[in-house]
Amino acid sequence: MKNTVTTFQKAKNNGEKLTMLTAYDYSTAKLIDESGINGILVGDSLGMVCLGYEDTLSVTMEDMIHHTRAVSRGVKNTLVVGDMPFMSYQSSVYDAVVNAGRLIKEGGATAVKLEGGATVIEQIKAIVNAQIPVMAHIGLTPQSINVFGGFKVQGKDEEKAQKLIEDAKKIEEAGAFAIVLECVPAKLAELITKAVSIPTIGIGAGAGCDGQILVYQDMLGMFSDMSPKFVKKFADVGELMKDGFKAYIKEVQEGTFPSKEHCFKIDESVLDKLY
């Protein structure tokens, strides 16, 4: 079944949990799509897990379009959400609409995601008015890492918790179809989920959200030096890959690979004529 923004809303209405993962390339997107997931986020997290940056701030629109286009080619039934990178929407409403349009038209995404609450309401409204579905993102917003002073849980005191609830309501009123809640106390995330009629997608926000999202490299255990508290390792792919790499190196060095079964043949009479 093809997943759309309507699918997301129906899931919330019916009490069905939504599932999302990140993807950044064709082959990964194809595998995730075949697994039956609801949505893929082509996140600006690619800056850290694919490009090796320390944060997401250096990711460009060209980066996002390039990776979103690859992911879009790999899916058949999954909703593809393209992340709007730092300074692609904060500077003006005009820039927000133009860049959102590029992720749809050039990247092949179905929807876009942008970070922020009350400060980006006008951008959300304008993008929605341009007939582009918007997924919002509040709580820990990685593009604001310099303001937060690091990757920290958000909404732990009354004032900040209340602001998150109010932001969620304003986001819904602006026309967004879903909200990502990142690194928010579980009980607060549950309150926000009940306060809005659109789906909430949690990452480090407890099981009370309408759905969950993780960075696929994290949940597959691909990086031993990156292990956020909220991540469960569903497979140990990193170690499996290293074992495979080591086995390949060993067999090449020993001369056991490639063996006859991996080689192509030529008639000996042809060889005789070459000398």
Curated annotation (Swiss-Prot):
Stored InterPro entries: Pantoate_hydroxy_MeTrfase, Pyrv/PenolPyrv_kinase-like_dom, Pyrv_kinase-like_dom_sf
Active-site residues, record numbering mapped to chain: E182
GO molecular function per UniProt: 3-methyl-2-oxobutanoate hydroxymethyltransferase activity; magnesium ion binding
Cofactor(s), names only, from the UniProt record: Mg(2+)
Annotated 3-methyl-2-oxobutanoate binding sites: D44, S45, D83, K113
Alphabetic keyword roster: Cytoplasm, Magnesium, Metal-binding, Pantothenate biosynthesis, Transferase
Cofactor note: Binds 1 Mg(2+) ion per subunit.
PANTHER family according to UniProt: 3-METHYL-2-OXOBUTANOATE HYDROXYMETHYLTRANSFERASE
Name used for this protein in its record: 3-methyl-2-oxobutanoate hydroxymethyltransferase
Residues binding Mg(2+), per UniProt: D44, D83, E115
Family: Belongs to the PanB family.
SUPFAM superfamilies assigned to the protein according to its UniProt record, in alphabetical order: Phosphoenolpyruvate/pyruvate domain (SSF51621)
Main subcellular location: cytoplasm
Enzyme class name: transferase
Cell compartment(s), UniProt: Cytoplasm
Gene giving rise to this polypeptide: panB
Pathway named in the protein's UniProt entry: Cofactor biosynthesis; (R)-pantothenate biosynthesis; (R)-pantoate from 3-methyl-2-oxobutanoate: step 1/2
Superkingdom, natural source: Bacteria
